Protein backbone atom coordinates (compact mmCIF):
# COMPACT_ATOMS: atom_id res chain seq x y z
CA UNK A 1 0.00 0.00 0.00
CA UNK A 2 1.47 3.35 -1.06
CA UNK A 3 1.08 6.61 0.81
CA UNK A 4 -2.18 8.39 -0.01
CA UNK A 5 -2.67 12.14 0.07
CA UNK A 6 -6.45 11.80 -0.21
CA UNK A 7 -7.19 11.15 3.47
CA UNK A 8 -6.09 14.47 4.93
CA UNK A 9 -8.72 16.90 6.20
CA UNK A 10 -8.96 20.32 7.80
CA UNK A 11 -9.44 18.58 11.17
CA UNK A 12 -6.27 16.50 10.76
CA UNK A 13 -4.32 19.54 9.56
CA UNK A 14 -5.44 21.62 12.54
CA UNK A 15 -4.67 18.75 14.93
CA UNK A 16 -1.19 18.36 13.45
CA UNK A 17 -0.53 22.08 13.78
CA UNK A 18 -1.47 21.88 17.46
CA UNK A 19 0.40 18.67 18.35
CA UNK A 20 3.52 18.74 16.14
CA UNK A 21 5.98 20.15 18.69
CA UNK A 22 8.32 17.15 18.41
CA UNK A 23 8.57 17.53 14.63
CA UNK A 24 9.08 21.28 15.00
CA UNK A 25 11.88 20.90 17.55
CA UNK A 26 13.52 18.17 15.44
CA UNK A 27 13.29 20.45 12.41
CA UNK A 28 15.01 23.29 14.24
CA UNK A 29 17.87 21.00 15.22
CA UNK A 30 18.16 19.91 11.58
CA UNK A 31 18.35 23.52 10.38
CA UNK A 32 21.12 24.16 12.89
CA UNK A 33 22.93 21.03 11.68
CA UNK A 34 22.62 22.37 8.11
CA UNK A 35 24.19 25.67 9.22
CA UNK A 36 21.54 27.73 7.48
CA UNK A 37 22.47 31.36 8.03
CA UNK A 38 21.41 34.92 7.35
CA UNK A 39 21.06 35.67 3.65
CA UNK A 40 20.44 32.07 2.56
CA UNK A 41 17.71 31.17 0.08
CA UNK A 42 15.96 28.05 1.41
CA UNK A 43 13.35 25.63 0.08
CA UNK A 44 11.32 23.81 2.76
CA UNK A 45 9.94 20.65 1.12
CA UNK A 46 7.02 19.08 2.98
CA UNK A 47 6.53 22.24 5.02
CA UNK A 48 3.18 21.14 6.45
CA UNK A 49 1.50 23.96 8.35
CA UNK A 50 4.56 26.19 8.08
CA UNK A 51 5.84 26.29 11.65
CA UNK A 52 9.42 25.42 10.70
CA UNK A 53 9.28 27.51 7.53
CA UNK A 54 8.41 30.59 9.58
CA UNK A 55 11.30 29.86 11.96
CA UNK A 56 13.70 29.49 9.02
CA UNK A 57 12.50 32.84 7.64
CA UNK A 58 13.45 34.50 10.92
CA UNK A 59 16.86 32.81 10.80
CA UNK A 60 17.74 33.87 7.23
CA UNK A 61 16.47 37.39 7.86
CA UNK A 62 15.49 40.07 5.34
CA UNK A 63 18.54 39.36 3.21
CA UNK A 64 17.46 35.77 2.64
CA UNK A 65 14.24 34.04 1.65
CA UNK A 66 12.35 30.81 2.19
CA UNK A 67 9.69 29.04 0.14
CA UNK A 68 7.53 26.25 1.57
CA UNK A 69 5.85 23.53 -0.49
CA UNK A 70 3.61 20.66 0.59
CA UNK A 71 1.24 18.36 -1.32
CA UNK A 72 -1.52 18.74 1.30
CA UNK A 73 -3.83 21.63 0.47
CA UNK A 74 -5.32 21.93 3.97
CA UNK A 75 -1.88 22.32 5.53
CA UNK A 76 -0.76 24.93 3.03
CA UNK A 77 -3.93 26.89 3.84
CA UNK A 78 -2.93 27.01 7.52
CA UNK A 79 0.65 27.98 6.61
CA UNK A 80 -0.55 30.90 4.48
CA UNK A 81 -2.61 32.25 7.38
CA UNK A 82 0.28 31.75 9.81
CA UNK A 83 2.85 33.68 7.76
CA UNK A 84 1.32 35.78 5.02
CA UNK A 85 4.70 37.22 4.03
CA UNK A 86 6.15 33.81 3.12
CA UNK A 87 5.53 32.04 -0.19
CA UNK A 88 3.70 28.73 0.36
CA UNK A 89 2.71 26.57 -2.60
CA UNK A 90 1.10 23.17 -3.13
CA UNK A 91 3.79 20.90 -4.55
CA UNK A 92 5.64 17.61 -4.23
CA UNK A 93 9.27 16.67 -3.71
CA UNK A 94 9.38 14.72 -6.96
CA UNK A 95 8.52 17.79 -9.05
CA UNK A 96 10.37 21.02 -8.29
CA UNK A 97 9.98 22.32 -11.84
CA UNK A 98 8.56 25.58 -10.47
CA UNK A 99 12.09 26.45 -9.35
CA UNK A 100 15.10 27.27 -11.49
CA UNK A 101 18.27 25.20 -11.42
CA UNK A 102 20.86 26.21 -8.81
CA UNK A 103 18.46 28.62 -7.10
CA UNK A 104 18.75 27.57 -3.42
CA UNK A 105 21.52 27.50 -0.85
CA UNK A 106 19.66 24.85 1.14
CA UNK A 107 16.74 22.42 0.87
CA UNK A 108 15.12 21.18 4.06
CA UNK A 109 13.05 17.97 4.26
CA UNK A 110 12.11 17.60 7.92
CA UNK A 111 10.00 14.54 8.85
CA UNK A 112 8.92 14.02 5.25
CA UNK A 113 11.44 11.86 3.34
CA UNK A 114 9.87 8.58 4.51
CA UNK A 115 6.57 9.67 2.94
CA UNK A 116 8.08 10.46 -0.47
CA UNK A 117 7.06 7.80 -3.00
CA UNK A 118 9.87 8.25 -5.54
CA UNK A 119 12.94 9.08 -3.49
CA UNK A 120 15.52 8.92 -6.34
CA UNK A 121 13.43 11.35 -8.39
CA UNK A 122 13.03 13.69 -5.42
CA UNK A 123 16.77 13.68 -4.74
CA UNK A 124 17.50 14.36 -8.40
CA UNK A 125 15.19 17.37 -8.24
CA UNK A 126 16.82 18.58 -5.03
CA UNK A 127 20.26 18.30 -6.59
CA UNK A 128 19.07 20.28 -9.61
CA UNK A 129 17.76 23.23 -7.58
CA UNK A 130 20.72 23.37 -5.19
CA UNK A 131 23.61 25.67 -5.93
CA UNK A 132 27.09 24.11 -6.00
CA UNK A 133 28.02 23.65 -2.36
CA UNK A 134 24.36 23.79 -1.34
CA UNK A 135 23.04 21.56 1.44
CA UNK A 136 20.15 19.14 1.74
CA UNK A 137 18.97 18.38 5.27
CA UNK A 138 16.71 15.42 6.04
CA UNK A 139 15.16 13.83 9.10
CA UNK A 140 13.54 10.47 8.46
CA UNK A 141 12.49 7.15 9.99
CA UNK A 142 14.64 4.25 8.77
CA UNK A 143 13.01 0.86 8.91
CA UNK A 144 15.38 -0.68 11.46
CA UNK A 145 14.68 2.03 14.06
CA UNK A 146 10.89 2.13 13.86
CA UNK A 147 10.49 -0.72 16.34
CA UNK A 148 12.34 1.27 19.01
CA UNK A 149 9.67 3.97 19.23
CA UNK A 150 6.74 4.22 21.63
CA UNK A 151 4.05 4.02 18.96
CA UNK A 152 5.26 0.70 17.55
CA UNK A 153 5.81 -0.71 21.05
CA UNK A 154 2.23 0.10 22.07
CA UNK A 155 0.42 -0.58 18.79
CA UNK A 156 2.08 -3.94 18.11
CA UNK A 157 0.52 -5.88 21.01
CA UNK A 158 -2.92 -4.33 20.41
CA UNK A 159 -2.88 -5.21 16.72
CA UNK A 160 -1.58 -8.67 17.57
CA UNK A 161 -4.75 -9.68 19.40
CA UNK A 162 -8.24 -10.53 18.20
CA UNK A 163 -10.09 -9.23 16.25
CA UNK A 164 -7.29 -7.18 14.69
CA UNK A 165 -4.74 -9.97 14.25
CA UNK A 166 -7.07 -11.87 11.93
CA UNK A 167 -8.06 -8.92 9.77
CA UNK A 168 -5.25 -6.33 9.73
CA UNK A 169 -2.30 -6.76 7.37
CA UNK A 170 0.50 -4.76 8.98
CA UNK A 171 2.68 -5.20 5.90
CA UNK A 172 0.18 -3.00 4.03
CA UNK A 173 1.09 0.09 6.07
CA UNK A 174 2.90 2.65 3.86
CA UNK A 175 5.86 2.91 6.28
CA UNK A 176 6.40 -0.85 6.44
CA UNK A 177 8.60 -0.46 3.35
CA UNK A 178 10.73 2.37 4.69
CA UNK A 179 14.34 2.34 3.56
CA UNK A 180 16.98 1.16 6.00
CA UNK A 181 19.80 3.54 6.90
CA UNK A 182 22.11 1.64 4.53
CA UNK A 183 19.57 2.02 1.72
CA UNK A 184 19.14 5.71 2.49
CA UNK A 185 22.89 6.28 2.24
CA UNK A 186 23.08 4.37 -1.05
CA UNK A 187 20.14 6.31 -2.50
CA UNK A 188 21.69 9.65 -1.54
CA UNK A 189 25.08 8.76 -3.03
CA UNK A 190 23.51 7.43 -6.23
CA UNK A 191 21.79 10.81 -6.68
CA UNK A 192 25.18 12.50 -7.00
CA UNK A 193 24.99 14.23 -3.63
CA UNK A 194 27.83 13.90 -1.12
CA UNK A 195 26.83 12.73 2.36
CA UNK A 196 28.43 15.09 4.87
CA UNK A 197 26.87 14.15 8.22
CA UNK A 198 24.53 11.48 9.58
CA UNK A 199 23.37 10.96 13.15
CA UNK A 200 20.71 9.10 15.10
CA UNK A 201 18.12 11.43 16.59
CA UNK A 202 15.51 11.07 19.30
CA UNK A 203 12.26 13.01 19.36
CA UNK A 204 10.07 13.13 22.45
CA UNK A 205 6.81 14.74 23.50
CA UNK A 206 4.42 14.25 26.40
CA UNK A 207 0.72 13.93 25.56
CA UNK A 208 -2.15 14.52 27.95
CA UNK A 209 -3.94 11.24 27.29
CA UNK A 210 -4.16 8.25 24.97
CA UNK A 211 -6.69 9.87 22.69
CA UNK A 212 -4.25 12.74 22.09
CA UNK A 213 -1.53 10.25 21.12
CA UNK A 214 -3.82 8.58 18.58
CA UNK A 215 -4.75 12.02 17.21
CA UNK A 216 -1.06 12.92 16.98
CA UNK A 217 -0.13 9.79 15.03
CA UNK A 218 -3.14 10.00 12.73
CA UNK A 219 -2.58 13.68 11.95
CA UNK A 220 1.18 13.16 11.48
CA UNK A 221 0.39 10.51 8.86
CA UNK A 222 -2.33 12.67 7.25
CA UNK A 223 -4.87 9.87 7.66
CA UNK A 224 -2.62 6.95 6.64
CA UNK A 225 -2.15 5.53 10.15
CA UNK A 226 -5.24 3.27 10.09
CA UNK A 227 -5.71 2.87 6.35
CA UNK A 228 -4.83 -0.82 6.45
CA UNK A 229 -7.52 -1.43 9.10
CA UNK A 230 -11.00 -2.49 7.87
CA UNK A 231 -13.38 0.43 8.33
CA UNK A 232 -15.68 -1.46 10.69
CA UNK A 233 -12.77 -1.99 13.12
CA UNK A 234 -11.33 1.52 13.17
CA UNK A 235 -13.51 3.02 15.92
CA UNK A 236 -12.87 0.14 18.32
CA UNK A 237 -9.15 0.15 17.48
CA UNK A 238 -8.88 3.86 18.29
CA UNK A 239 -10.46 3.17 21.69
CA UNK A 240 -8.18 0.19 22.37
CA UNK A 241 -5.06 2.09 21.30
CA UNK A 242 -5.98 5.09 23.45
CA UNK A 243 -6.41 2.77 26.45
CA UNK A 244 -3.04 1.13 25.77
CA UNK A 245 -1.33 4.53 25.61
CA UNK A 246 -3.15 5.66 28.77
CA UNK A 247 -1.54 2.72 30.57
CA UNK A 248 1.84 4.43 29.95
CA UNK A 249 0.75 7.68 31.60
CA UNK A 250 2.98 9.21 34.25
CA UNK A 251 2.91 12.43 36.29
CA UNK A 252 3.78 14.53 33.23
CA UNK A 253 1.54 12.72 30.77
CA UNK A 254 2.31 10.02 28.23
CA UNK A 255 5.88 10.21 26.88
CA UNK A 256 5.99 9.37 23.18
CA UNK A 257 9.45 8.89 21.71
CA UNK A 258 10.71 7.89 18.31
CA UNK A 259 14.15 7.38 16.83
CA UNK A 260 15.30 8.29 13.37
CA UNK A 261 18.20 9.64 11.38
CA UNK A 262 19.16 13.18 10.49
CA UNK A 263 21.59 13.76 7.67
CA UNK A 264 23.09 16.57 5.65
CA UNK A 265 24.22 16.07 2.06
CA UNK A 266 25.96 18.52 -0.24
CA UNK A 267 25.92 19.23 -3.92
CA UNK A 268 29.54 19.26 -5.03
Regions from the PLM with identified roles:
Residues 1-40, 51-55, 75-78, 92:
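Conserved class I S-adenosyl-L-methionine
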Residues 5, 22-23, 49-51, 173-268:
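Conserved Class I S-adenosyl-L-methionine
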Residues 43-45, 49-96:
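Class I SAM-dependent methyltransferase SAM/SAH-binding core
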Residues 62-63, 130-135:
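Short glycine-dipeptide loop
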Residues 97-107:
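A short acidic, Gly/Pro-enriched loop at the edge of an enzyme's catalytic core
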Residues 106-119, 142:
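A short SAM/SAH-binding and catalytic strip from SAM-dependent methyltransferases
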Residues 120, 135-208:
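Conserved catalytic/acceptor-binding region of the Class I
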Residues 121-125:
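Short, conserved SAM-binding segment of the class I
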Amino acid sequence: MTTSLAHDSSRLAETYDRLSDSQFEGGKRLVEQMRIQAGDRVLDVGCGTGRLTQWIAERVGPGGSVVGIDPLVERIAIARVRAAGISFEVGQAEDLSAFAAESFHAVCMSAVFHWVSDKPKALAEVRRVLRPGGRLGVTTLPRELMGAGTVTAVCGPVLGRSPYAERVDLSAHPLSRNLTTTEIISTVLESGLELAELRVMRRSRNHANGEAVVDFVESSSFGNFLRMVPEDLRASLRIDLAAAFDAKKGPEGIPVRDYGTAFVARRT
